[in-house]
Amino acid sequence: MPDQRELLLAERALAVDRIQLLEREFADIAASADGTDDEHDPEGATLAFERQHTAALLDQARAQLAAVDQALRRLADGSYGTCTRCGRLINADRLAARPVATTCIPCATSRRTR
């Protein structure tokens, strides 16, 4: 599946870029808060929120990168496109929409309804 590999590599590049951007943003927030007492400074609550928000976005970007790397490993070992729960093939439309999918739609749906 060379098209999937290209798609995954493009997603990986986007995730790496996003991580780098968010790391710079987090460093900028930390630098602007340097010496600020969050508790008594009127800007402190805003800075604390920005820091938490950016940290959460950074965690999401890192999780996305890990999912893409896992998908690339599955592609290399030949298990990409096979549902990890039932062993059936994952629909091509699902993989096109969500290239890091590890489950087919029926398994993903049954997991959500439990």
What are these regions (language model features)?
Residues 81-84, 102:
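Cys/His-enriched microdomains
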Residues 91, 109-112:
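Short functional micro-motifs and their immediate structural scaffolds
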